[in-house]
């Protein structure tokens, strides 16, 4: 209790994932402070197990040199640990900042490069994740089987793994995802059966979803999400649904900006006079053959897409409808990144 570790150089932990070899481990303690310390060549950086009200601040953390991503440990790992503050850490060549069965934690103003995921929660609730920036990882932020958390003002750039995302929600309910920027990722937002809990809503508002391969990918939708005031710009595909029978019609859309919107604004109120409609054409080739996205923008693919819209071979399916699409980006400054 009340241990303070400040201005330390900590190097050379063991390599056992089973034993959770770490630079610093806290077991059933309270009020630990780890500040302004450097962790190098450690499997796990800081490991909190039933450790509450810790402050992990201003540290430089990297994992074992030469280890590929699955063999690395987490920069910070919280297990059944609550009310902790994890802020202003620089994390690189590590795995995740992860919280398992941990609630009421604040994870903010951390910076990371070349990790696996940025922030990862499992079976956790009531956490605040804000003002973090991560780039070059295999994935972005992952929230799995978690509830009632606020995720705001984060920047996720160039998540380039096979399933690279800005943010992924897996069986996650009651989330507020707002004012984030998802840029140059394989997917900006991935929603997998989220929300899960009946009667809950995920609110996704005022985010910048920019220049991703897919802006929004939906899987097995069963409950409503609300999409409000987001900017979809430069994405190869604005949105897709990969699960027939999903209840995507439950989702609500309003006040979003879509760079492919072709409507007019005769009364100049900044809102399009006709709804933005996004259809899925069964003959749109890369819905079924993702490798064809390599040829996006080519003359042949552009021609096929034009013909599909002009004379589709099958009835298109409506994926989303925004009745009040914006004519200009909601956040023009960020949209020019």
Explain the meaning of each model-derived region:
Residues 13, 51, 64, 94, ...:
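Flexible loop residues that form catalytic
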Residues 54-56, 65-67, 84-86, 95-99, ...:
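Extended, compositionally simple hydrophobic/Ser/Thr-rich segments
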Residues 160-162, 166, 175, 188-197, ...:
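Functionally critical loop-and-helix segments that line ligand-binding/catalytic clefts
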Residues 2-108, 113:
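Right-handed parallel beta-helix
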Residues 2, 7, 31, 43, ...:
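Detector for repetitive beta-architecture
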